[in-house]
Amino acid sequence: SNIKVITEPISDEEMVQLYHNHDVLIYPTYGEGFGFIPLQALATGMPVISTYDWAHYKNFLGPLKLKSELIDSPWPFPHEGKVFEPNYQHLLELMRDVSMNYNAYSGFYFAQSTKIHEEYNWLQLTNNAFDHIFKKFR
């Protein structure tokens, strides 16, 4: 089998290596909090097929944005409310397209990765998040 379930914590270096050992991240999710997994993959330059309607990083998904539909959650507990159901027919189309045009997608997403590193500078994000608090005590 070419599927391996990782149940133990892995180091940052192992995580980067995991991304570099694969060609495409396929992430058809109904919803996500921050979305570290696709963001990390995008930051390595990996093409990512992902649901985008809720994603704060949707501007970086480019042509591999996976269509979805806003529906009532099929899991009333503990996830009541609305979710974005991935369009699996569109997922198949995107997977086929990226497999046939991998070099073009790879170049596009590699170019996008520098923009992600600029926008998601953790020190700057932290400073922006807490700046209003720091100003009160200066």
Question: What is each stretch, according to the model?
Answer:
Residues Q17-H22:
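Short alpha-helical donor nucleotide-sugar binding micro-motif in glycosyltransferases
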Residues S1-E13:
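Nucleotide-activated donor-binding/catalytic signature segment of Leloir-type glycosyltransferases, i.e.
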Residues Y30:
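Aromatic "clamp/platform" in nucleotide-sugar-dependent glycosyltransferases that forms part
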Residues G35-P38, D53:
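Short glycine/serine-rich donor-binding loops of glycosyltransferases
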Residues P86-H90, M100-D131:
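A charged, aromatic-enriched C-terminal amphipathic alpha-helix characteristic of glycosyltransferases
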Residues P47-T51, G62-K65:
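Short hydrophobic beta-strand element within catalytic cores of glycosyltransferases
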